[in-house]
Amino acid sequence: KYVYTLFPHQTQYVLDENELAIIPNSVPIKRCLLTANMETAINAMWDTLPSCGDKILIIGAGIVGLLMAYILKAIPGIEILLIDKDNRKRKMAKLFNIKFDQKIPASYQANIIYECSGNASVINELSRHIQDETTICILSWYGDNITKVRFGEEFLSKRAKIIFSQVSKVSHNRSKYWKNSDRKKLAISLLNDDKLDNLIEKNMINFYDLPKFFSNISKHKNFYCKVIDYGVKKNV
């Protein structure tokens, strides 16, 4: 059997059984590299509880943003607009039948916004696209970057709710019933769709070439999930 786990780049290690998730035969091994990102999207969904009729705005069409749109699209009657300044992402959005634009239309207002761009400065722009009591769910990690946010304007008058969806803990809306290991199994099961292979880099990077790869990271600007070959000669 093949298993999925989160672990730093090493060729050999010992883990407890509870740190592993068995990969079902229906899901290709390489596609399971999207598991952590799918868990992020699941947790954000649990944090915000979207439903039929919601108007959704997703900022950032990287892997997390696309997976967020992908699982939200399964909800009947939901409207989703995916935003990314990189027009090359339009092709990927079309593949998943997701409405795409490079800029937020001036009149567009959403009741749930998912910020997946990694750029905290976009938060101020979102103030022009909220309804009363809109929830802004931040999936990005900003590190130690500092950004000024104008909380005293639309965010205040429209009682906006801003939450950070941190994937290390299961959302409080589901923590009574779900453990991290359960959520991981759910994420893997949701990867049973061949279309998701389009998010993964076709070429693999040899484990021993990683230092060279990261030293030239600026040359590798595509958003695809990278695949590392640890030298195990198996067909994945």
Regions found by a protein language model. Name each.
Residues 149-201:
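C-terminal substrate-binding/catalytic core of Rossmann-like NAD(P)-dependent dehydrogenases/reductases
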